[in-house]
Amino acid sequence: MLYFAYGSNLNLFQMKRRCKDSVFLKKYELKGYRLNFRSKYRAADIEKNKNSLVPGALFEISKSDEKKLDVYEDYPILYKKLYFTYYNKTVMTYIMVNKTEFRYPTERY
């Protein structure tokens, strides 16, 4: 399956450690969304915005990798899944369930 990574999941070392089967495919800009930081964790999120884009990357991931990401992203409590199409292929990413106010990102970003 295709996965769109943004925020801290762009760290290739971290992705490979967490998702052993993951394969980086390419840089990708998700149009019609913008990057935001929310929640008490000051974690990355994306939200619709027709004039913006989110820098990220496309990865091929296994079902096992998806399950590991679900745990890491606290799915479905903190994040839910968003699907979009890229060249007739379905791509999955995560967006926050509760859209809290903007918070400055953590140092690791």
Residues covered by each model-derived region:
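Glycine-aromatic micro-motifs
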Residues: M1-Y109
